[in-house]
Amino acid sequence: MAVSLLSPGLKTEFESHAQQELTHADRLASRIQQLGGVPIFNLKELAGKAAAVGNHPEQGTTLTEMVIENLMLERRQVEAYSALIREIEDKDLITREILLEILADTETHASELADFLKRSSDRR
């Protein structure tokens, strides 16, 4: 069955993803503090750091563009978390476990967004 990008399922999925992203941020901030660091909560500072490493998210003007942009960001996060996990190896098992759990959620988010886009395009 085809699914419209306007379907209630997409809204529910975005709400779920947003809640999970907040949980990820809280977990990472707590771990940074446990390790003696200071997490960054200022959005302008975060955006500046993201831009410094080549992340320049675009604001979509249509719902489809927004879903595509979100999917690209999720895929970039998968790459970033995977690289961190490889770098950490067995040096910090607690952080590694947190990152593995977040990676699994992020891979699921990407898969769900790709599925919504595919089903939406199949409908056309």
Regions found by a protein language model. Give the residues of each.
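Iron-associated oxidoreductase/ferritin-like identity signal
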Residues: 1-124
